[in-house]
């Protein structure tokens, strides 16, 4: 950035000032040149500077522009501009979410940069995939994936290993596809879906001349166990049918990442994760990633119209602010907090004559309760504890089990961002109400 300040101040001061400016701009230049998530997070002032410089490239910032279109990024207040970081034109074009927008060169660069940083971030965690940030959350991102499967592979029925998650069910309904549920079975305390039952469902649909797509679940509340995505991916490869994975909070723990790495050797068309659950953004954005670049392109083509830049910018801000080094530290802290949660729950269970359920989940734990679990969860809420989930044994949706589950229970989470003091406090409150 050339600034002519010659003669305004002494030469030695001019040189010193230009050096400082150059070093500050170098941080921005490095982001644009390297196009990788930084190892160490960048401070907010430099992030704001980057966003401001990019937004100044959009045509609505041109002081001599003549605006005669029906969509010219006209907003009434500065408050509205601030809400989208001044990217009022949004992202994408009517035919493709990731296409550059002629009226918004800056927003187009911002979106492309976000996707590049997102791919490098996932690579730093061990996932060598293509990725896009989406302007919609998990459920609608799943709908985009299913819509793309319908368009590319003529899929007309979703094979869904049953999980009590409304988003995938509504996503399927939203795009007008039929869903075939595969029932869960009880294995000790765990609720799971047998891979053989999934294959049976696939075979039946194919025999009826249908084109199934499998929507498996990697992350969910216990006692529902993660689907065996590696074996499902093998089956989908054998039958040559698409496979979408709901991995809402898969990025935050290596337990899930390792499962993904193994499964990605076989048939996975797309994985969907949440930006708020993994990247500390406000709710509203999603992350879709896959090794199949052509299918990712197909997904972007299913989005109708332009989109708000807000969820995309929030993902970019998180990637820049956190940095890969601090994110790995946050993952480590999450694992330590989960270990502490398990230990304290075991002590509490012994004290109260309850049981910590033996479930395979690196994020959440379950403790039984002789009291009404909904009442317990309600009391925790009134004690200013948010997040615990009370489930009655006969709640077929809550337990993910279509028969009666053996226990009433409370689910307590230890997701990324939680602190040890939060764990101690929730156990203290649980002690009061159990």
From Swiss-Prot:
N6-(pyridoxal phosphate)lysine carried by residues = 277
Pfam families recorded: SepSecS
How it assembles, according to the record, is: Homotetramer.
Q: Does the keyword Transferase apply?
A: yes
> Which residues are noted in the entry as substrate-binding?
93-94, 101, 306
Q: Where does pyridoxal 5'-phosphate bind?
A: 71
The feature of type site (May act as a substrate filter by repelling compounds with a negatively charged alpha-carboxylate) is located at 70
Cofactor annotation: pyridoxal 5'-phosphate
Query: GO:BP terms for this protein?
Result: conversion of seryl-tRNAsec to selenocys-tRNAsec; selenocysteine incorporation
Tell me a Gene Ontology molecular-function term this record carries: tRNA binding
Q: Where is this region: Tetramerization?
A: 1-40
The record ties this protein, via NCBIfam families, to:
selenium_SpcS
Top-level EC class: transferase
Q: In which pathway does it act?
A: Aminoacyl-tRNA biosynthesis; selenocysteinyl-tRNA(Sec) biosynthesis; selenocysteinyl-tRNA(Sec) from L-seryl-tRNA(Sec) (archaeal/eukaryal route): step 2/2
Purpose = Converts O-phosphoseryl-tRNA(Sec) to selenocysteinyl-tRNA(Sec) required for selenoprotein biosynthesis.
Q: Which reaction does it catalyse?
A: O-phospho-L-seryl-tRNA(Sec) + selenophosphate + H2O = L-selenocysteinyl-tRNA(Sec) + 2 phosphate
Domain of life of the native organism: Archaea
- Kindly provide the name given to this protein in its UniProt entry: O-phosphoseryl-tRNA(Sec) selenium transferase
Annotated stretches, region: Phosphate loop (P-loop): 92-102
EC assignment: 2.9.1.2
The organism named in the record is: Methanocaldococcus jannaschii (strain ATCC 43067 / DSM 2661 / JAL-1 / JCM 10045 / NBRC 100440) (Methanococcus jannaschii)
SUPFAM superfamilies named in the record: PLP-dependent transferases (SSF53383)
Keywords noted in UniProt: Protein biosynthesis, Pyridoxal phosphate, RNA-binding, Selenium, Transferase, tRNA-binding
């Amino acid at each position: 950035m050339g600034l002519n300040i010659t003669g305004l101040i002494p030469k030695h001061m001019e040189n010193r000032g230009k050096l400082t400016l150059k070093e500050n701009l170098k941080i921005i230049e490095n982001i644009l040149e390297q196009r990788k998530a930084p190892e160490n997070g960048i401070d907010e002032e430099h992030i704001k500077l980057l966003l401001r410089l990019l937004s100044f490239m959009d045509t609505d910032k041109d002081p001599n522009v003549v605006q005669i279109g029906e969509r010219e990024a006209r907003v009434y207040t500065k408050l509205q501009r601030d809400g989208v970081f001044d990217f009022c034109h949004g992202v994408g074009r009517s035919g493709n979410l990731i296409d550059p927008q002629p009226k918004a060169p800056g927003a187009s660069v911002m979106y492309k940069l976000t996707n590049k940083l997102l791919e490098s971030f996932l690579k730093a965690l061990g996932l060598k995939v293509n990725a896009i940030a989406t302007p919609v959350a998990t459920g609608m991102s799943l709908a985009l994936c299913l819509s793309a499967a319908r368009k590319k592979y003529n899929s007309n029925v979703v094979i869904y290993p049953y999980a009590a998650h409304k988003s995938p069910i509504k996503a399927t309904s939203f795009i007008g596809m039929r869903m075939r549920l595969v029932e869960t079975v009880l294995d000790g305390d765990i609720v799971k879906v047998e891979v053989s039952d999934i294959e049976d469902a696939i075979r039946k649909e194919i025999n009826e001349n249908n084109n199934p797509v499998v929507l498996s679940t990697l992350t969910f509340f216990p006692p529902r166990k993660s689907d065996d995505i590696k074996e499902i991916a093998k089956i989908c490869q054998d039958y040559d049918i698409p496979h979408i994975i709901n991995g809402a909070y898969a990025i935050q723990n290596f337990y899930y990442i390792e499962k993904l790495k193994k499964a990605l050797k076989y048939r996975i068309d797309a994985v969907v994760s949440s930006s708020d659950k993994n990247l500390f953004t406000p709710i509203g954005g999603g992350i879709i990633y896959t090794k199949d670049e052509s299918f990712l392109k197909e997904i972007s083509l299913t989005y109708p119209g332009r989109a708000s830049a807000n969820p995309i910018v929030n993902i970019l801000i998180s990637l820049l602010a956190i940095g890969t080094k601090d994110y790995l530290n946050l993952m480590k802290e999450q694992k330590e907090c989960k270990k502490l949660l398990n230990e304290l729950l075991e002590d509490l269970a012994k004290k109260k004559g309850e049981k910590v359920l033996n479930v395979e989940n690196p994020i959440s734990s379950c403790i039984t309760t002789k009291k009404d679990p909904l009442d317990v969860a309600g009391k925790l809420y009134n004690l200013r504890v948010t997040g615990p989930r009370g489930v009655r044994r006969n709640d077929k949706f809550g337990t993910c089990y279509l028969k009666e589950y053996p226990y009433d229970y409370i689910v307590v989470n230890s997701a990324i961002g939680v602190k040890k003091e939060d764990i101690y406090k929730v156990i203290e409150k649980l002690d009061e109400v159990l």
